[in-house]
Design a protein with these regions (language model features):
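Structural preference for solvent-exposed beta-strand-turn elements
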Residues: 1-180
Length: 180
């Protein structure tokens, strides 16, 4: 067994800035889809999943500018909803599990979202059922396309309701709250 020996009496000084957390960054970045105003986010981690989500948002028309180290502005004024139906969007969504977090904001603002069965990291049991059941309880309708293995999710008007999720899911909860 390994151990650390800590000797006291030595004054520490200085500052550190911890890297932003991936899952929180994915949620906050997707939340920028809820408004057409510019949003500035600091401490965005420079990691593959976050960078791929930023590229995906650019593809759908979000204006993204890097304004400093780990700091970006996002403006979702000109979203191209037609891009959601294209093969390129579906392919990119399938390789990025975090893309599922776009559903809530897109449903809330535009009444439409498309999602491919996402990939990404494979840690444990990572179902999307919690997200989908929550959206259905808010009034969204799902249509599965066998050919593209995608779901088109539509809602003319989402309506808040009491909800007890079938499993604990931080991203599911965040996604449902963004839709509500």
């Amino acid at each position: 067994m390994e151990s650390f020996i800590i000797e006291g009496g030595h004054m520490l000084s200085g500052t550190i800035t911890p890297q932003g957390a991936k899952n929180e960054a994915l949620e906050v970045i997707c939340a920028t889809l809820l408004t057409n105003e510019e949003v500035r986010i600091k401490n965005i981690p420079d990691i593959l999943d976050v960078n791929n989500l930023i590229l995906l948002l650019k593809d759908i028309g979000v204006e993204v500018n890097r304004v400093g180290k780990n700091e970006y502005t996002f403006c979702s004024k000109n979203i191209d909803l037609g891009y959601l139906d294209g093969e390129e969007f579906v392919r990119k969504c399938a390789s990025l599990r975090g893309s599922v977090l776009m559903i809530g904001p897109l449903l809330a603002r535009f009444g439409k979202a498309v999602v491919a069965k996402p990939g990404g990291d494979k840690i444990g049991r990572r179902r999307l059922d919690t997200h989908f059941l929550g959206f259905k309880k808010l009034g969204a309708k799902f249509v599965h396309s066998e050919g593209t293995n995608t779901f088109e999710i539509k809602a003319n008007r989402l309506k808040g309701t009491y909800m007890l999720l079938d499993e604990a899911s931080v991203t599911g909860t965040a996604n449902i709250i963004m839709a509500a």
